[in-house]
Amino acid sequence: MAHTYLVPYDGSDNAKKALNWAIDYAKLTKARLEVLNIQPSFKTVHAKTLFNKQDIEEYQCQLFNECTTGVEDALKNSGAEYSLQMGVGDPKEVLVETVKASRETANPIDLIIMGSRGTNPFFGGVLGSVSYAMINSGVCPVMIIPQEK
């Protein structure tokens, strides 16, 4: 049975490095990659008052497309089997739920490969809040790709 690796991708330099590492590792291990970009839900009183559901969904898709520009080409060129998807919500919760849901599929996620820090400058020192949460979730092994020094 082939392995499946989940790669959270937020467009940060660390996420790009982790994706490149995951692509190389998937080629070596003949694994499948699931690249997941997670957009905010915008479920606030102000957002619901000012925007309708369709506007919010269109904006999330726009952010997804901007963030993942070039990702699909890199995945196609890798020769690895892959999927590129968008999730919506809190990244920690979406990642845990994605791993758990995959257990009921033909391609359960064996490993999360992610950068040590993402795009949020307010949380985390050496290790970002999402990376830290994934390690502590215990849903599956996590490989952290360190940021450039």
Regions found by a protein language model. Name each.
Residues N52-E66:
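A short acidic, glycine-rich active-site loop
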Residues L111-A133, S137:
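Glycine-rich, Arg-bearing micro-motifs that act as flexible, cationic patches
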